[in-house]
Amino acid sequence: MFLFKTTNNLRKSLSNKFFCTRYSKNHLWISINNNNNSNNNNNNNNNIIIGTLGLTENGPINKFDDVLYIKFPIIKDENQVDDEPLTISLDTISDQILLNSPIRNCKLISINQDVLDYPNYINSSPMSKGWLCKIKFSNINDFNSLMNKNEYDNYCKNKIIKI
């Protein structure tokens, strides 16, 4: 009995830390906590999902190109609905890059202050310290339509070969 309780507690603890990450063709990643999505398996799109958005290491920023400035949209009032896509602007030494969220009708809810203070985290640590922002959305199908890690890796490999 004690072992069973310990196993259930361990399973519960591990499930709280499980994240699902999906990738877009424009090299953005979105990660959601598994529990965040637990009520959405019935295709009910009214539940709010919180996701972390970032740029992958295969993104449009050259590893040797310093990010000078990042511009996020204004975080709007909770009740405001924005039909415009979420767009983040990255200024580098050589270019300005516009990143459009692959999730439709998402809302910016917080910005990674560390990335504003140290923009090169996007290059040096894109999947951990270099995350960009937190978004909320309600349609899990938008998230599920993105690529998983294997699909994304194959996409990147095939894209490099075609060039």
Swiss-Prot record:
Family: Belongs to the GcvH family.
Gene3D superfamilies attached to this UniProt entry: 2.40.50.100
Cysteine pairings via disulfide bonds: none
Xref: CDD domains: GCS_H
Keyword entries, A-Z: Mitochondrion, Transit peptide
Organelle targeting sequence: 1-23
Record localization: Mitochondrion
UniProt name for this protein: Glycine cleavage system H-like protein gcvH5, mitochondrial
Example GO biological process: glycine decarboxylation via glycine cleavage system
Family annotation (InterPro entries): Biotin_lipoyl, GCV_H, GCV_H/Fam206, Single_hybrid_motif
GO cellular component, one term: glycine cleavage complex
Domain Lipoyl-binding: 50-136
A Pfam entry, by short name: GCV_H
Superkingdom classification of source: Eukaryota
